[in-house]
Amino acid sequence: MPSDTRILIVDDHEDTLYALESALAPLGHRIGRATSGDEALKQVLRGGVGLLLLDVCMPGLGGLEVVRYMRRVEQTQHIPVILLTGFGVDHALATTAFRLGVADLLLKPVDPWSLRTKVRYLYDAHRRHLALEREVRRLRALAREHPGTPAHPASPVLPHPGAHVPTQRPQGAHAGELEKDRG
């Protein structure tokens, strides 16, 4: 993931933004902020966002609407999103959020240690996903440049996964001893 990629935190309350920034500061990642869904969507569409912490209820465009839009746009559909709510999690909210591909749904105030753990995991997973996509594009470009070369370099031949694997011991070995122990 490019070094200019950041975590974007979105909430309409300044004190919540400050608390989230403070909780995430030990991770050492760049952090951006937005105070509305509209502003968040603009930043996400400009690029450079590797993870989004997004409040569910905000004036104007709410968190779920932002996620719905992001999932329809190819460049933003794989950005991990953690939704935050201060009103509790009901079944309808959780169902909608997870159907949209939200990574997690957390209650405010958020436990800083738990938040850092989840953010570290999701941010790193997204960074690895992007690196794999870049590598696939690079390999496809190489394959187009050199169409006559084999796709895979010579490598040791491994047995087919369905091949018979011998058992560790002959059938029936120690069976008499097992029967004797049971009696």
Give the ranges of each region predicted by the language model.
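Two-component/phosphorelay signaling modules centered on CheY-like receiver
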Residues: P2-R6, E14-G32
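Active-site residues of response regulator receiver
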Residues: D11, D55, T85
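Acidic catalytic/metal-coordinating carboxylates
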Residues: D12, T35-E39, G62-R68, V89
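Short amphipathic alpha-helix used as the core "switch/output" element in two-component signaling
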Residues: K42-Q43, L64-Q77
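Active-site beta3 strand of CheY-like receiver
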Residues: G48-L54
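Alpha4 helix (beta4-alpha4-beta5 surface) of REC/receiver domains from two-component response regulators
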Residues: E65, Q77, G88-D104
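A Lys-centered signature of the CheY-like receiver
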Residues: L106-K108
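C-terminal output helix
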Residues: V110-V119, Y123, R127
